[in-house]
Amino acid sequence: KEKNAVIAKNEQLRADLLRAISHDLRTPLCSISGNADMLLSNSERLDEATKHQIYTDIYDDSEWLIGVVENLLSITRLNDGRLKFKFTDQLLDEVIAESLRHISRKHDDYKIVTDCEELVLARMDVRLIMQVLVNLVDNAIKYTPPGSVICIRGTKTDGKAQISVEDNGPGIPEEMKTHIFEMFYTGKTTVADSHRSLGLGLALCHSIIEAHEGTLVLTDHDPHGCNFTFTLPLSEVTLNE
């Protein structure tokens, strides 16, 4: 029975994955194709501002697809037990700074601030933790209006390294909170860009943090907004301050 349950779960995962890919990846691919066709057939009749916007749209759609592929690869390898972890000791402030260099250019419309304690050394697979941070910040960008403030904090709390991504957006409805870390869950939202999600990012983040023997939780940010907080084990190496 246990073996049959695993097979059924894998079949359901495969079906959900195919459905999500066929439906949600079609939109950016059609956008790229349509914009490229416009440039090829009407380039001489388009002014520079219009061309620049088309180039920007193609770039943004391509970057989104790259992010989706990276998430797909990671989550399938994680589920199959094929994802190899390479744990090293890393400074939180350096990991946060490097992660911000990988955030979508759309963050220019947002105020992203960092507040990190110095010399907090954590044990992590740095590539995967950067993927977690990129996903959490992208999620904050997706569900908050331009001009919002997103704050990334790094601290040492209760014998663990802790990173939080806070936003001052509208927050997440109560009915979504219990499902927010489920794979393929995108919720019912009126956000214009909500179709641009396979519901993989937060599920992947949760799995990666669990593999680090940490926790990832969602809380409300006062007075409004969301606060995603995750913990990592502190390094056993001591830094001389």
Where are the regions that the model predicts?
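Short conserved segment of the HATPase_c
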Residues: 172-184
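Short alpha-helical Gxxx[C/S/T] motif in the catalytic ATP-binding
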Residues: 201, 205
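Conserved catalytic submotifs in the C-terminal HATPase_c
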Residues: 86-91, 111-121
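Short helix-loop "hinge" at the ATP-lid/N-box region of the Bergerat-fold HATPase_c
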Residues: 140-141
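Short alpha-helical segment of the dimerization/phosphotransfer core of two-component systems
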Residues: 60-65
